[in-house]
Regions:
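Catalytic cores of phosphodiester-bond-cleaving enzymes
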Residues: 10
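Active-site loop segments of alpha/beta catalytic cores
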Residues: 1-3, 14, 18, 38-45, ...
Length: 191
């Protein structure tokens, strides 16, 4: 927090990013082995079938250490800079699914098994919406959703429409209906 506030003051820019929240994949899939058979704890590269989706743990924000840390950061930032906008970067359901599948398997699923990718996105949607509500209630000024960019790689409009669009529209509507301000950071002509 001191670093963010100090840097903002020194450079004079507006707004502070409290962080990028990646706790959903870790909480739901961190107990599962990745494609190398290792349990790393971050939930990356652990879902490769419908059976793996069933092995995911339910999302419990009260038990998520990453969310607790982010909420504390928001509280400290608000105390230090009460009038400065604070935002959090979050993943849309498809981005959480992408993490849970791992990059190579996710791209492959989007082309060869889009039903699996959509099923996983649907499975994590409630967790994304719930996290967004908690962060909004914590006092952030807006939520930032980068999409449809995955780890710096853009995807085609066709793949976006086939695998991701419906989930994004639905989740974003639920979050906006709650009253949250969101920024959708698009990549390419997807508006």
């Amino acid at each position: 927090t001191e670093c963010m506030v100090g840097t903002r003051r020194k450079l004079g820019y507006d707004g502070m990013c409290a962080g990028a929240y990646g706790g959903i994949s870790a909480m739901m899939g961190g107990h599962l082995p990745n494609s190398e058979g290792k349990i790393v704890g971050d939930g990356d590269d652990v879902v490769h079938s419908r059976e793996d989706i069933e092995k995911l743990r339910p999302y419990d924000p009260k038990k998520c250490p990453m969310l607790k840390n982010l909420l504390k950061t928001i509280e400290l930032m608000r105390k230090e800079e009460p009038d400065e906008p604070i935002y959090v970067i979050l993943h849309v359901p498809a981005a959480v699914a992408f993490t849970l599948m791992g990059a190579k398997p996710a791209f492959k699923a989007m082309v060869k098994n889009p039903e699996l990718f959509r099923a996983l996105s649907d499975h994590v949607e409630d967790a994304v919406v719930e996290s967004s509500k908690i962060l909004w209630d914590a006092g952030v000024d807006f939520l930032w959703f980068p999409m449809p960019n995955f780890g710096g790689y853009c995807i085609s409009r066709k793949t976006y429409e086939k695998c991701i669009s419906e989930s994004n529209i639905r989740a974003n509507k639920r979050i906006k209906d709650y009253g949250a301000n969101i920024v959708i950071h698009t990549c390419g002509p997807y508006d």
